């Protein structure tokens, strides 16, 4: 069986869950091809990118110059190359294909792809990718069934929903399977009109064989706090920094490290400077997986205070939390989106309300006083939860069976 992965951009260092799923299907013995519209960041990559030689497995459909005018010229040129083919003309149907017709994306792809790209099933990560995949299938560019995974921003952001809700409703008809990563998103897809029989919750998970539980350790002095996240609003790192200001005022000894890159980097650095926290808060930027693991080994607590963005953008269920729980690092997060489906408050971790820096500071201060006897049962339940409900190997085998039955 051949499995295709259809992505808008690949690779992206922040989307380790996509990378992990691709390599898992390779490891299970499936023939795997990656089809991506645009080339992502091939410099800041994880070890699996090289180990599995994923560049050789990837077909990029839009190898374009930068700049709006240059892109349109390039697309027009590609469109003209295939103007003698029926599907290139069909791709210019504004009424049927909307913005992707108007901006010449579909016609340019039709112009350059002579032989259809085939897979038994394409897994499209994020709703908009599923929408594009379904259009390209209708145009004969790809051939195979389409299963679309809905993660977070694609089913929560107001801007995305304003644009894509009619497109999603078309996808519910054209696509073969919708795979929300949480029960919350499954309910939302149903409310948007997706037939229940086309929905199956398929969670993101972690490879438990990569995460051996570390010994339970009491919080150190200073308390070692860590976050690993893309630097965006919904990660709530601005709330974490405000909580750090309060912790420092209270005289709590701590060090906080934020690993990741993203559009909010300058804003977060400015906040650190404004609060004069440079001595206790560090932002070392992107780190590959093996370096992140080494830093996590020293952490006392993993912090991810996710919030709903101003545009409505929400998390799915963050894989970073699963990884921390799998290795035995206590987690502090928020009552946000699907996170309570993973973290049971005061049982397998600690949850505070969104956007509540005071509650977050209080929780971290209280955490710093816990001993190993208090931590041990929480850490045990956390790993058991991930092992039972978020075990990547089990999830991927179940997904493979689901796709084979399509």
What are these regions (language model features)?
Residues 158-162, 190, 196, 206-221:
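Acidic anion/phosphate-binding donor-loop and adjacent secondary structure
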Residues 179, 217-235, 241-244, 302:
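Conserved donor-binding/catalytic core segment of Leloir-type glycosyltransferases
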Residues 184, 205:
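Carbohydrate-associated surface elements
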Residues 267-290:
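Nucleotide-activated donor-binding/catalytic signature segment of Leloir-type glycosyltransferases, i.e.
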Residues 280, 359, 366, 373-389, ...:
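A short, well-ordered alpha-helix in the C-terminal region of glycosyltransferases
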Residues 297-312, 329:
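Acidic donor-binding loop of glycosyltransferase active sites
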Residues 321-326, 330-333, 343:
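Short hydrophobic beta-strand element within catalytic cores of glycosyltransferases
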Residues 345-346, 350-357, 366-372:
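Conserved acidic donor-binding segment of nucleotide-sugar-dependent glycosyltransferases
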